[in-house]
Amino acid sequence: MKLFVHLVLFISLFIPYFTKAALYVDIKKSSVGNIGLVVSKCTCKTALESELSENIAKVIGTNLSNCGLFNVKRGAEAESKSWKSDTVVTVSLSEISGSALELSFRLFDTFTKRELLTQSVVFPAKDWRKIGHLVSDVIHDRLIGEKGHFNTKITYIAEEKDSNYKSVRKIAVMNQDGSNIKYLTNGDRFVSTPRFSPNGKGIVYISYANGKSYIILKNLKDNTESIISTFEGVVSAPRFSPDGKSLLISHSLGGETNILSLDLSSKRTKKITKGSAISTSPSFSPDQKYMAFSSDISGSQQLYVIDFTNKSKKPKRISFGSGRYATPVWSPKGDLIAFTKIQSGKFYIGVMKPDGKEERLLSEGHKIESPAWLPNGREIIFTRTESPSNSKLYLVDLVKKNQKMVSTPTNASLPDWSYF
């Protein structure tokens, strides 16, 4: 049965203060994607007001549509009277000075005739997109009861051919909606596996030169970078600890590939796995008590979990399906582990419980890999490679398994999504 939320969200010009209300829809008890939402704009006095209100309305509509919880109507469809039983977002702005505008809104329940929320914000015109994301977060928070992720970012490897048809790889970062793309490296060296720090202020990545591996931290605020550590051999698959104090890495040297913990303060390393097995792709649980990783301890590549609260710290195998398993990533909620599965020449992105139960495959393809979680714990971004010259980023949701491509101007791979 289609769910309608009897709410109207008006953006007015007369509310100079903030208040809050506690009302939300329990999505666990609702039909996902069936919350009716109409996004429209009010008549504006100036050309600037009209242009920016339309832009902000478009950002809000796109954000809430893409999150998979709302059935969003825009344009002519939004002008019909069917919105009376849907949630309505009406965008309007007022110019305060040459470059400053005021955006205010109230949340109104048409069923109970009760005002639920009033807010107002003054912002420079250049920040209109950020304001659109902010309003999207507020709507998501009030209607769903969960913090929105619309002011987060995506990092990935951008790859294209230069004039000599040589592959050039750069670290890229962009807003979650694909806007404001920036390249953090210039393509003069091989780079791999960018990963956000827990606070989102930095990105760590690996660079290789002269037979050595360099772990580099990029400061996103001032664009400076520093070498955290240098290793002989090959380092791969860096992953921050949830508290941001250490890194998990995979290190290959002398015929062994083991997982190390690197303390970011002392720069000291500690071996977590030992032996001749190839162990890689480590990922902490959110509480930092467990670590998932892939290894061929049993003879084939499988998923394992180490319990750090257990003195023995013996790896426990959790994958028992046919095929090989790789790149485990713990969800931000701690309830699932995403992974790549390779079976009979096909690749799959799937999830399972931390104990290995309830395995579900969400997507399949010629070559799909490198899953990373969105902050909401309900969607996964991954790499889909159709050919050596065609790799793109895709999203898949856990409930309906709907997929959509994330637009990038070049080939893209190895994504990571910042948390709140």
From Swiss-Prot:
Superkingdom of this protein's organism: Bacteria
Keyword Cell cycle: yes
Signal peptide: 1-21
Cellular location(s): Periplasm
An example Gene Ontology biological process: cell division
GO CC, alphabetical: periplasmic space
Keyword annotations from UniProtKB, A to Z: Cell cycle, Cell division, Periplasm, Signal
InterPro entries for this protein: 6-blade_b-propeller_TolB-like, PD40, Tol-Pal_TolB, TolB_N
Subunit organization: The Tol-Pal system is composed of five core proteins: the inner membrane proteins TolA, TolQ and TolR, the periplasmic protein TolB and the outer membrane protein Pal. They form a network linking the inner and outer membranes and the peptidoglycan layer.
Function comment: Part of the Tol-Pal system, which plays a role in outer membrane invagination during cell division and is important for maintaining outer membrane integrity.
Family of this protein: Belongs to the TolB family.
PANTHER family given in the database record: PROTEIN TOLB, PROTEIN TOLB HOMOLOG
UniProt protein name: Tol-Pal system protein TolB
Species annotation: Wolbachia sp. subsp. Drosophila simulans (strain wRi)
Species lineage: Bacteria, Pseudomonadati, Pseudomonadota, Alphaproteobacteria, Rickettsiales
